[in-house]
Amino acid sequence: MLKDIFRKKRKYATLSSLPPKNSEGGLAYFDEPSPEQESTRKELPDGLWVKCPKCGEALFNKDLVENQRVCLTCSYHFRIPARERLEHLVDPGSFAEWDRELQTTNPLSFPDYEEKLAEAYQKSDVSESVLTGQASIEGMPVVLAFNEGNFMMGSMGSVTGEKITRAIERAIELRCPVIIFSTSGGARMQEGILSLYQMAKTSAALGRLAEEGLLYISVLTDPTFGGVTASYASLGDIHIAEPGALIGFTGPRVIKQTMRKELPEGAQTAEFNQSHGQIDCVVERAEMRKVLGRLLRYHQEGAV
């Protein structure tokens, strides 16, 4: 036929565009999944895998948690809940929590604040955005405070400031060093000026700690911003940060919107802050206990 004469002859091998047929003559790739296969799919729990935002690697969530939430491929430091951090840091069974009964109210009758607090209680296992208490690290007593990022982004309200201040005052009574792990978006807007008071309150308490000659180590984690950066996070005798932690007063997006300027790439990272003298050292999470233990030994009362 004429169409066969003018048809272009292929000089290369080709594959059929149709999938192979199954034993019953149907198209194998278009078969519906069996009930057993469908059941298996539905039984897979949510959150089984986590994608690393830095390297893109798919990580088994259980392995990630066991590795202190540090990527096994590129060492990216994920954010970690306060109690998980605590378990990896202190001597087993040594932590005694303080002031768990303190809870936030709504002193300014801010709209929807109670609902946001209720959500925060459900998302975390702390009563406020900070966990405080006493423990030991490598056998040395220490007073600790951990911001909880899952509780309203670790924001500082009245109860947060009160718990940190009480912890510092007890450290003075006990003659113990203080370590605070900061993770916060800043002062809590729902409490207005009452939240801003906490900057002065915690700073004054740390001033009394310094007058007593007691050590304060500030550990800045991702993210540390706003009123927390402008108060207790920046008042340490020694400042440590985790790798890649974002540290500053205002985020780059807000700076761009208000100042019409863009920050240099990486300008608010822990490494940038260290290179400009704001941070003394950047420490991997897996090494944090060992480094803190060494610093506590160096600064023990009576040590040479």
From Swiss-Prot:
Per UniProt, Zn(2+) binds at C52, C55, C71, C74
Q: What are the protein's GO molecular function terms?
A: acetyl-CoA carboxylase activity; ATP binding; carboxyl- or carbamoyltransferase activity; zinc ion binding
Q: Which domain of life is it from?
A: Bacteria
Query: Where is it mostly found?
Result: cytoplasm
Q: Where's the CoA carboxyltransferase N-terminal domain?
A: 48-304
**Cofactor binding notes:** Binds 1 zinc ion per subunit.
Q: Which Pfam families match?
A: Carboxyl_trans (PF01039), Zn_ribbon_ACC (PF17848)
The answer, when asked if Lipid metabolism is one of the entry's keywords, is: yes
Please provide one cellular component term from the Gene Ontology annotations of this protein.
acetyl-CoA carboxylase complex
Q: Where is this protein found?
A: Cytoplasm
| Alphabetically ordered keywords of this record | ATP-binding, Cytoplasm, Fatty acid biosynthesis, Fatty acid metabolism, Lipid biosynthesis, Lipid metabolism, Metal-binding, Nucleotide-binding, Transferase, Zinc, Zinc-finger
Specify the pathway: Lipid metabolism; malonyl-CoA biosynthesis; malonyl-CoA from acetyl-CoA: step 1/1
ZnF segments: C4-type:
52-74
The record's InterPro entries line, in alphabetical order, gives: AcCoA_carboxyl_beta, Acetyl_CoA_COase_Trfase_b_su, ClpP/crotonase-like_dom_sf, COA_CT_N, Znf-ACC
What's this protein's function?
A: Component of the acetyl coenzyme A carboxylase (ACC) complex. Biotin carboxylase (BC) catalyzes the carboxylation of biotin on its carrier protein (BCCP) and then the CO(2) group is transferred by the transcarboxylase to acetyl-CoA to form malonyl-CoA.
Subunit-structure text: Acetyl-CoA carboxylase is a heterohexamer composed of biotin carboxyl carrier protein (AccB), biotin carboxylase (AccC) and two subunits each of ACCase subunit alpha (AccA) and ACCase subunit beta (AccD).
The UniProt family comment states: Belongs to the AccD/PCCB family.
Q: What is this protein called?
A: Acetyl-coenzyme A carboxylase carboxyl transferase subunit beta
Species, as recorded: Desulfitobacterium hafniense (strain Y51)
Which classification does the entry list for the species? Bacteria, Bacillati, Bacillota, Clostridia, Eubacteriales
